[in-house]
Amino acid sequence: MERLIALLREMGIPFAYDHFAEGESPDPPFLCYLLPDSGHFPADGRVYFKIEEVRIELYTDRKDPAAESKVEAVLDQHGIFYARSEVRIESEKLYEVLYSFEMEGNNDAQEE
């Protein structure tokens, strides 16, 4: 999680986990991130290697290639392979660009 937070800070866009509190959402662009699933690798009846699914949602009020480039540059710089999709949320008058990828979880407890 610390690595993910460092990546988000490096992007230079305001972010929150899942959503901003009511009335505290910044003006676009902003990011929301989620850890909706895991694909842990088992061995000997326990979690041997933790893998987290990560979703970073970029919200903008118009198509914003500069904001997308900020996110993608950081992911690319750190060698993160991601899938990207985009949708217009008409009810919110926002664009959402979704970046999905897997990231190593906290594996500090592994025996060497």
Regions found by a protein language model. Give the residues of each.
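Long, contiguous binding/interaction regions
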Residues: 1-53, 59-112
